Amino acid sequence: MTDYRAGFVSFVGRPNVGKSTLTNALVGEKIAITSSKPQTTRRAIRGIMHRREGQLILVDTPGVHRPRTLLGERLNTLVESTLGDVDVIGFCVPADERIGPGDRFINERLDDYPRAKKVAIVTKIDSARKTQVAEQLLAVSALREWEAIVPVSAVNSIQLDTLTTELMRLLPVSPGPLYPDESVTDEGVEDRIAEYIREAVLDGVEDELPHSLAVTIDDLVERDDKDLLEIYANLFVERDSQKAIVIGKGGSRIREVGATAREPIEALLGRHVFLSIRVKVAKDWQRDPKQLGRLGF
């Protein structure tokens, strides 16, 4: 009988190289929000894959970058602490972008984690020509000795089984699974709701605004008179001008955000919800240790 394997794999890379999309595709459920905006991921989010031969716990981390705020510093620290605990590191680079200084910086930092086995993942091959993919595979292979190099498309489900097989074989032998069979993530319900709201706000906002957004959940209230869950959320920005952008003319933008967020929230909970979002200003919260703490960072 083949040994059962279980362990942790972390995907790392620059912001916006497809780490969260890949995590969701492998798990088969949306457990990490996605956006074209860099630094969408702000926590180490675990997605759990169950296979007959083992269990893969995928840890999606924030993109590594040069921090400009205290929040940025804390996100980089989170990545570093996560990488010290995992069994395999999957270094993600997109097929349609040449390897640059940011990629090389992250690759060099991988030497700080000798315990973890290293796999290179060339993402977004659906967005690149075959010649581009071939060139990127050669460029990646020149960076270091990898346990494996796998080109994938999370969007089109290309080579995901191959990637899973390669990751699984690198995990340690385990007497059994580390998480129950029904688990797909260890994220709490309130955290997932807050993330779905933030994802809805990210769609269509200007580049500087995404970093200024944070969402907390005040309360979940069961209605006695009908099968409805009331959700009361706070959406924080850093300036009054940002508050006006998020709310929109006559509240049009925030209503749109609520309607967009309700869909995945109702799918998650399997029921109808009433969603109330209050927009508040927390001045320069990304640079304020006390406010960062209150917002969960």
Swiss-Prot record:
Family: Belongs to the TRAFAC class TrmE-Era-EngA-EngB-Septin-like GTPase superfamily. Era GTPase family.
Top-level taxonomic group: Bacteria
MF (Gene Ontology): GTP binding; GTPase activity; ribosomal small subunit binding; small ribosomal subunit rRNA binding
Entry membrane topology: Peripheral membrane protein
Source organism of the structure: Leifsonia xyli subsp. xyli (strain CTCB07)
Oligomer and partners: Monomer.
InterPro entries: G_ERA_dom, GTP-bd, GTPase_Era-like, KH_dom-like_a/b, KH_dom_type_2, KH_sf_prok-type, P-loop_NTPase, Small_GTP-bd
Predominant location category: cytoplasm
UniProt protein name: GTPase Era
G1: annotated segments: 13-20
